[in-house]
Amino acid sequence: MSEMFSYTARPSSVIDQRMIAPAPLFPDMNQNSEGMRKLVQAKQTNDENYWSTMREVFAHDAETLPLQRFKVWMSTLSVPLMSQARHSEYIRLGLDAAQDPVYRDALTETYIGMTEQDHQMVFNMFSDFPTTMNRIQALGHLLFNGYDYEKIRSMKTIVELGGGVGDLCDTVYRLGFTGDYYIYDFPEISKLQEYHLTTAGHENVKFINSTDSLVAGDLVVATWSLTEMPLDLRDVVVDKLQDSKEWIVAYSNKIFGIDNDAWIKETFIPKMKNKTCEINALDFMPWDGGTFYLTVK
């Protein structure tokens, strides 16, 4: 009787192990891979070759790891493009602001670039508020320097030098910004930002990798980016953006052997003609010779 019937086994669904593996995701999903070796060496050496090496790692990761979880790639976490240092000053600013539903919405995690499980295991901070330290710090850069959502909404163009994973850009749009947002970064990092911000539905973001495409903005934001560039590139970038109205620059004093405090005071500030420049020390970030905000208004 059985020979009268044929049976077709239902194919079992194939599960992408990369989507369910516990975070962090190492290069090639292997803690002992060549990519991981490069990453560790770059971090330990931390010299002028750091970013050339990390660009290779990110390029390889983009080909072999899921973009849906790029925020828990080991490369992303190690730079870090996703901050996990829980500074109470930023947390205070964020929680105070979150009493306003506009800020609370901007701080709420969207789970783009991570799974809900990733958030719970790696980034979760509160039992009743799904946010991340990265989002709190992004908003903190604005609030610490006097940029509330009304001021952000009044702007038409914002330029960010080194956009991280795109959280500051996402925050700005969720605060009600409707203008054009330019992110200048390495192509390998732009790919991550574009995935994040396009998925989030932000249509007016320009991802640029050439100084030729830089435009003056109502606000330029450069958090640990302008002051990590080679000196000759800094000059080109600042000259291109010299007509920008306002700046927020966060920097640490010593990076790759360069005295950033001297560069800020002797090179950058003299180029800001007819503007008020103010430097504030961030005492809760004492590493690398001290950390500072410079505002130009």
List the predicted regions and their residue ranges.
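N-terminal accessory regions of S-adenosyl-L-methionine
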Residues: 1-138
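Conserved alpha-helix/loop element of class I SAM-dependent methyltransferases that forms part
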Residues: 135-155
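Conserved class I S-adenosyl-L-methionine
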Residues: 154-164
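Conserved SAM-binding loop of SAM-dependent methyltransferases across substrates and taxa
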Residues: 165-177
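S-adenosyl-L-methionine
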Residues: 195-214
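A short SAM/SAH-binding and catalytic strip from SAM-dependent methyltransferases
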Residues: 220-232
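A short, conserved alpha-helix within the catalytic core of class I
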Residues: 229-241
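Conserved beta-strand signature within the Rossmann-like core of class I S-adenosyl-L-methionine
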Residues: 244-256
